[in-house]
């Protein structure tokens, strides 16, 4: 089997990807048997290509799965931890923009009663 390109895999359905993954795994096991029995050098060099192809297929499957989960949870109140933005612990606990801008009744009253003074400069 020739080297598989990730862009070709992205258009395929999940069932097709799983079938291709199964085929690659079977091929890899055959190549490993050939390695033990003393197969040709061309087969031995093919092991690396097949392993990388398996990794590509699995990567595409995982990426599409995660993308679908992101779409599903978009706009929902709670998201799984692995879909939330990875920030530092302190940043996650920080007040959000709305909470930072909230003012107490006393503070609002004080600002209303004593607004900032505007001074005119005499030229």
From Swiss-Prot:
PROSITE patterns: RIBOSOMAL_L29 (PS00579). It comes from the Eukaryota. GO terms for biological process: maturation of LSU-rRNA from tricistronic rRNA transcript (SSU-rRNA, 5.8S rRNA, LSU-rRNA); translation. The keyword Oxidoreductase does not apply. Disulfide bonds: none annotated. It comes from Sus scrofa (Pig). Keywords: Acetylation, Cytoplasm, Isopeptide bond, Phosphoprotein, Ribonucleoprotein, Ribosomal protein, Ubl conjugation. GO terms for cellular component: cytoplasmic side of rough endoplasmic reticulum membrane; cytosolic large ribosomal subunit; large ribosomal subunit. The lineage of its organism: Eukaryota, Metazoa, Chordata, Craniata, Vertebrata. GO terms for molecular function: mRNA binding; structural constituent of ribosome. Component of the large ribosomal subunit. The ribosome is a large ribonucleoprotein complex responsible for the synthesis of proteins in the cell. Component of the large ribosomal subunit. InterPro entries: Ribosomal_uL29 (IPR001854), Ribosomal_uL29_CS (IPR018254), Ribosomal_uL29_euk (IPR045059), Ribosomal_uL29_sf (IPR036049). Belongs to the universal ribosomal protein uL29 family. The modification Phosphoserine is found at residue 29. It is found in: Cytoplasm. The modification N6-acetyllysine is found at residues 19, 43. It holds the Pfam family Ribosomal_L29. There is a cross-link at residue 25 (Glycyl lysine isopeptide (Lys-Gly) (interchain with G-Cter in SUMO2)). Its main location: cytoplasm. This is Large ribosomal subunit protein uL29.
């Amino acid at each position: 089997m020739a080297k598989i390109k990730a862009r070709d895999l992205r258009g395929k359905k999940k069932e097709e990807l799983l079938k291709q993954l199964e085929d690659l795994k079977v091929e890899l096991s055959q190549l490993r048997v050939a390695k033990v029995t003393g197969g040709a050098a061309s087969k031995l060099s093919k092991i690396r290509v097949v392993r990388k192809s398996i990794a590509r297929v699995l990567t595409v499957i995982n990426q599409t799965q995660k993308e679908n989960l992101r779409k599903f949870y978009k706009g929902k109140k709670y998201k799984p931890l692995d879909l939330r933005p990875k920030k530092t612990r302190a940043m996650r606990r920080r007040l959000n923009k709305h909470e930072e801008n909230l003012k107490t009744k006393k503070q609002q009253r004080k600002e209303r009663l004593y607004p900032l003074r505007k001074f005119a400069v005499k030229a």
